[in-house]
């Protein structure tokens, strides 16, 4: 907005400024400052009125703070939460309104009365539910709407001007919401009906029924746009599969509840028609207002009731009147039962006939009764199909991956049978598929991460892999940017027990960072006889470090390095793999990896360097032992020669004059010579072969650190 306002500000040149007076100049500068500061930020433009008295009327949803203004974003979380709350209130209202049909009660005195206790309870509940409709109207006056002209580009601009919001709402949806919020049943049963007497009492019941049905249909209609708003905001009506199935089952039960209450009201009407027909035969002794319980104190009514045969004429066994599908209400005296009894029976009647599409309904020739049976049959077909279809959709969403895994496993079994794989290979394949399903439940993590934005994908990878990568001492010394680059390129890997990760001598194409499980790493130094080195690696360890010198080489080659060890899984293993090309990319992009500070860390934690260091120390120790034992043999030889001189000498002068001379050909001289030779040959044979074997062990290739900038 600042750029738009800047076009309206006139910039004067130096000549014009000289002509201006000092007061006018300062006034213009202050004016320009006020205009630029007014539209400096979107939030300021909303909170502060403009200089010409007009406020900002439209804005994008991300350009204002919803906590500082009293206009709600229709796509925001608050409106979405309120829509869900209001939807629950609407469902409660749809459940409460049919209960007004249970107000008429057939008394034993052959009259129809209203249940006062039920009237009070329903009035309280209905008034509480109506309050949500009033609150909804108020919220709609405070909710912005999207400008129709801006929908062609992106999400559109929000109209936040209160007058425009009110005008738009009053033109479209206010009147339907207002009629739906009116407490019409309460007004009728408490203010209108008690003031009606005589023959108009019977007609008033029809008015209550028609008004209730009209408002009920209107509230039922308002649920569909409300559900569509929730679906647009969150993508689905219910996030959980069981919640979606329960939602449609609730709607089906609600339809059964409505049909049952309607059937009860029509049963009351049919029974009243039977009484009217009998009353017509006894005219003028019988009047229609006698059928209302307000006339119980009338002595003429009591005299007529004693003389009439009303009970026999309106009995279910009489052929005077056909009750048709309402025969159960008369036979079981449902119309004169208490509320819980008649409610549950009517609910069962509605559910039974809705599920069977009205197959068991035996109607009479009454037109209204036949129409009601037709409506029951049609609603039963439609609603039952919708219930089964939606519940199947929601329930299948929980097992669809399991079915996909079963189909894939069946295809695998057919392929293995077609290729005639041996039994042990089949078992390995089955074990791998089972372990993969248990570990992932058929979810492709890589596909999920690929669909996410780059920053969110980086954060998730960092959360999953950073602690694991930091457990590797070689990578713990790297900076955060390098660790993020490594984490982004790690891919999950699963291994079953007995899986050979890499064999000695095979090209190494990836590094593995172990998350869970144990592996066995061994080497024979290229298959040399008598050489074997083994170790165990587990959680937090890594293997495939032969790739590091290859990745750090400033003159890379296309030939991958050969593995110096055989790595095999002992238990079920979960790991992250870093392939050779990704490691090469990280090494090329981040020069920190070439730091000389990593040299000792790399040597200490590398199994290849550890093996070479152990062999180097053993070779040095063997050389030291051979030199030490050679010196000991020489000392023993000198002592033996000294003892020979002492043995053959006769006097002291001879003993000291030739201390190292031994008569040749003597038996002791020959024995001592053989003994010394055998000792030398034994020591040489013992350490010679080991030194030869260890001496031929090649030193691992060391990373090139010549290009670092330290």
Curated annotation (Swiss-Prot):
The protein's matches in CDD domains, at most eight in alphabetical order, are given as:
CAP_ED
> Membrane-spanning residues where?
85-105, 115-135, 174-194, 207-226, 248-268, 368-388
The record's keywords, sorted A to Z, are:
Ion channel, Ion transport, Ligand-gated ion channel, Membrane, Nucleus, Transmembrane, Transmembrane helix, Transport
Any one GO BP annotation for this protein: nodulation
**GO cellular-component term (any):** nuclear membrane
Which species is this UniProt entry from?
Medicago truncatula (Barrel medic)
Alphabetized PANTHER family for the sequence? CYCLIC NUCLEOTIDE-GATED ION CHANNEL 15-RELATED-RELATED, PROTEIN CNGC15A
Identify this protein by name: Protein CNGC15a
Q: Where in the cell is it found?
A: Nucleus membrane
Q: How does it assemble?
A: Interacts (via N-terminus) with DMI1 (via c-terminus). The Nod factor has no effect on this interaction, implying that the complex is maintained after activation.
UniProt function note = Cyclic nucleotide-gated channel involved in the establishment of both rhizobial and mycorrhizal associations. Required for full activation of nuclear-localized Ca(2+) oscillations by Nod and Myc factors. Simultaneous activation of the K(+)-permeable channel DMI1 and the Ca(2+) channel CNGC15 can give rise to sustained Ca(2+) oscillations. May function during fertilization in both female and male gametophytic Ca(2+) signaling.
The encoding gene is: CNGC15A
Tissue specificity, per the record, is: Expressed in roots, stems, leaves, flowers and pods.
One of the entry's Gene Ontology molecular-function terms is: transmembrane transporter binding
Biological classification of the source: Eukaryota, Viridiplantae, Streptophyta, Embryophyta, Tracheophyta
| Residues engaged in binding a nucleoside 3',5'-cyclic phosphate | 474-559
Q: Report how it sits in the membrane.
A: Multi-pass membrane protein
**What family does the Swiss-Prot or TrEMBL record give for this protein?**
Belongs to the cyclic nucleotide-gated cation channel (TC 1.A.1.5) family.
Q: Superkingdom, according to UniProt?
A: Eukaryota
């Amino acid at each position: 907005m600042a750029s738009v306002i800047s076009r309206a500000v006139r910039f004067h040149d130096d000549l014009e400024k000289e002509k201006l007076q000092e007061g006018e100049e300062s006034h213009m500068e202050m004016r320009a400052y006020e205009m630029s500061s007014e539209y400096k930020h979107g939030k300021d433009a909303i909170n502060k009125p403009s200089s010409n008295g007009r406020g900002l009327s439209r804005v994008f949803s991300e350009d204002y703070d919803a906590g500082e203004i009293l206009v709600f974003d229709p796509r925001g979380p608050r409106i979405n939460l309120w829509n869900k709350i209001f939807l629950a209130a609407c469902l409660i209202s749809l459940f409460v309104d049919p209960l007004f049909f249970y107000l008429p009660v057939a008394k034993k005195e052959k009259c129809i009365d209203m249940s006062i206790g039920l009237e009070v309870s329903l009035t309280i509940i209905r008034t509480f539910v109506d309050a949500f409709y009033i609150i909804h109207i108020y919220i709609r006056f405070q909710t912005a709407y999207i400008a129709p002209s801006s929908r062609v580009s992106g999400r559109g601009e929000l109209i936040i001007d209160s007058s425009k919001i009110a005008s738009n709402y009053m033109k479209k949806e206010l009147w339907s919401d207002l009629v739906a919020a009116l407490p019409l049943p309460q007004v009728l049963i408490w203010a209108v009906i008690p003031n009606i007497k005589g023959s108009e009492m019977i007609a008033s019941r029809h008015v209550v029924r028609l008004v209730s049905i009209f408002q009920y249909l209107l509230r039922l209609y308002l649920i569909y746009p409300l559900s569509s708003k929730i679906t647009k905001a969150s993508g689905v009506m219910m996030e959980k599969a069981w919640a979606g199935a329960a939602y449609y089952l609730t709607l089906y039960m609600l339809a059964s509840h409505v049909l049952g209450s309607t059937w009860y009201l029509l049963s009351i009407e049919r029974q009243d028609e039977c009484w009217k027909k009998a009353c017509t035969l006894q005219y003028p002794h019988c009047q229609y207002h006698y059928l209302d319980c307000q006339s119980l104190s009338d002595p003429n009514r009591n005299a007529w009731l004693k003389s009439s045969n009303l009970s026999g004429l309106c009995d279910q066994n009489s052929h005077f009147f056909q009750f048709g599908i309402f025969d159960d209400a008369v036979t079981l005296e449902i119309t004169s039962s208490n509320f819980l009894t008649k409610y549950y029976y009517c609910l069962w009647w509605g559910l039974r006939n809705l599920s069977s599409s009205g197959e068991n309904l035996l109607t009479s020739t009454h037109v209204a009764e036949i129409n009601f049976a037709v409506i029951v049959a049609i609603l039963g077909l439609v609603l039952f199909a919708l219930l089964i279809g939606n519940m199947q959709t929601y329930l299948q969403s929980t097992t669809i991956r399991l079915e996909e895994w079963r189909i894939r496993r069946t295809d695998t079994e057919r392929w293995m049978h077609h290729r005639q794989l041996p039994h042990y290979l089949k078992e390995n394949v089955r074990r791998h598929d089972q372990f993969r399903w248990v570990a992932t439940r058929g979810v492709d993590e890589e596909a999920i991460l690929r669909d996410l934005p780059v920053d969110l994908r980086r954060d998730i990878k960092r959360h999953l892999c950073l602690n694991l990568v930091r457990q590797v001492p070689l990578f713990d010394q790297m900076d955060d940017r390098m660790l993020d680059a490594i984490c982004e390129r790690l891919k999950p890997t699963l291994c079953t027990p007995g899986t050979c990760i890499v064999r000695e001598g095979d090209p190494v194409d990836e590094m593995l960072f172990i998350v869970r499980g144990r592996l066995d790493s061994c080497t024979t130094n290229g298959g040399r006889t008598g050489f074997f080195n083994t170790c165990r690696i587990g959680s937090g360890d890594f293997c495939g470090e032969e790739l590091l010198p290859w990745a750090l080489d400033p003159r890379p080659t296309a030939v991958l390095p050969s593995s110096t060890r055989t790595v095999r899984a002992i238990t079920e293993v979960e790991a992250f793999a870093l392939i050779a090309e990704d490691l090469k990319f990280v090494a090329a992009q981040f020069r920190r990896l070439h730091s000389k500070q990593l040299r000792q860390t790399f040597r200490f934690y590398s199994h290849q360097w550890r093996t070479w260091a152990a062999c180097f120390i053993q070779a040095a120790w063997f050389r030291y032992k051979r030199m030490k034992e050679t010196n000991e043999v020489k000392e023993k030889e000198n002592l033996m020669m000294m003892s020979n001189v002492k043995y053959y000498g006769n006097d002291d002068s001879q003993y000291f004059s030739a201390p190292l001379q031994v008569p040749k050909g003597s038996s002791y001289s020959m024995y001592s010579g053989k003994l010394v030779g055998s000792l030398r040959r034994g020591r040489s044979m013992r350490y010679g072969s080991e030194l030869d074997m260890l001496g031929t062990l090649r030193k691992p290739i060391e990373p090139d650190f010549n290009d670092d900038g330290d």
